[in-house]
Each structure stands twice: as structure tokens, then as C-alpha cells.
């Protein structure tokens, strides 16, 4: 299947959070909505077909994740990383921010230092701060190749100097899309 990534779909005025939120807040029309991970490409026909098939059942109750979900994740990890994972390693959460909060409270204590690599999705810092942990920054470096890279010397220094207990690793990085 081919995709048309050149098709421009104007979503303004459709209650689209990405664009209409700024307008409702009195921001300029040309403000770039870099604060939300929302694509402007048309959804794949495979996704549309799956949604239509589910909607045609006429029931919109709560669903449970089936074995097929684990098999898809495990297969991807093995194909791309040659890593066999176990099913009990996967934890279902209602979203990334909730998962970050679980991670912080499960693996650190109040006052512990957590390493955050900027630029990154703002809840990585917000969840850390809101749970009374200390944010230690290891800022990513924009290289000559116009890609962000980890400053490994600073990374090591920050871990030792601040006795970092946890690294919030966003991979791929949201906002740059880099994969480490």
C-alpha cells in the first residue's frame, strides 16, 4: 500500500486539540503546535478497516488486551532487537503519563534524583517534580548532522554527582524523533 504524505489535511475548526486549542487560548494562527504528538497524515486504511469492523459490532464496552498483543510486541522486540521478552515484563497502563508516575513511585523515594534528557515531552519533568523528586538534566546536544545526541561525559557526571536513581529514557525521543 502506498501513502500520500504530501496530502495536506486542514484540521482547523474540527475541534482538533492540536490547532483549535491555541485559537481558543488567543494564540496567533501561525503558532506551531509542537506541544502535542499528533500527526496530520491520513490514517492507514488498515487502521480504518479495523476500527470500522469493531464499530460494526455495536458494543463499545471495556476491552481486555489479549495474547495477540503480547505476541505482537514480543515478535517486534525479537525481530528488531534480537531480544526475547517474557509476558510478565509487560505492564498495561492507561497512558504514558500514568506509566511515568508508576515508574517514579515504584523505583524512587521522595527527594531522589531522576535524570531527564531535554528536549523531551514535558510530563517527564512534570511527573518527576509533582512526585517530589529532584530533576537532574542531561541535555541532548544538537550535532552538526542536525540530530540530537547524548552527551555521555555529562551523562556520567550527572549520575555520579547527583546520585541519580532513575533515568527517564524517552526512546524514540519526543520531540526530536531520535532513536537511541
Where in this protein do the model-derived segments appear?
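Active-site phosphate-binding strand-loop segment of PLP-dependent enzymes
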Residues: 142-180
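Glycine-rich helix-loop-beta junction characteristic of Rossmann-like nucleotide cofactor-binding loops
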Residues: 82-83, 104-108
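N-terminal small-domain helix-loop-helix segment of the aminotransferase-like
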Residues: 2-95
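Glycine/Thr-rich phosphate-binding loops of Rossmann-like dinucleotide-binding domains
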Residues: 100, 124, 176-177
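Short beta->alpha connector loops at strand-helix junctions that form conserved
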Residues: 118, 137-142
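Conserved PLP-anchoring active-site segment centered on the Schiff-base-forming lysine
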Residues: 106-128
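A short helix-loop-beta submotif of the ANL/AMP-binding
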Residues: 130-136
